[in-house]
């Protein structure tokens, strides 16, 4: 498995940050690697969805669990990516640390491109966090 980590400090409460990051349908606005989302089902704090990612317009299935105002965990259940993407909110005084951890591997022949895709995911995550910060702090 490949671990990719990134974090950013946002000058806002965890509640305010949560309002942005928990809007799963708005994910492509911040996460450029996510091109399209199709929700399959939703029950309580769990969403099953199909996402289209930027890499060759590949489709992946995810089960996303929301722990309100604390954590979002997306488990890739089908597609070229296996593993998880976790977004955690950590209140620090009057600010919020947003930490993203990808724990993934690429399935099949895609494994050959792990290094290139890891760099792409890291850059995309950094860019997403910066965009989220700008949106929240507006």
Per-region residue spans from a language model:
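Solvent-exposed residues in well-ordered beta-strands and their adjoining turns
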Residues: 9-13, 52-54, 65-67, 77, ...
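Glycine-rich portal/gate segments that line the openings of hydrophobic small-molecule binding cavities
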Residues: 28, 38-84, 97, 127-138
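Hydrophobic ligand-binding cavity/cleft-lining segments
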Residues: 1-44
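Short amphipathic alpha-helical segments
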Residues: 13-19, 121-124, 128
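Beta-strand/loop substructures that line and gate deep hydrophobic ligand-binding cavities in soluble
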Residues: 77-123, 127, 134, 138
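Short, flexible segments with low predicted structural confidence
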Residues: 2, 60-61, 103-104
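Short, contiguous strand/loop micro-motifs
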Residues: 12, 73, 115-116
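Residue-level signal for beta-strand positions within conserved beta-sheet cores that form or flank
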Residues: 33, 60, 94
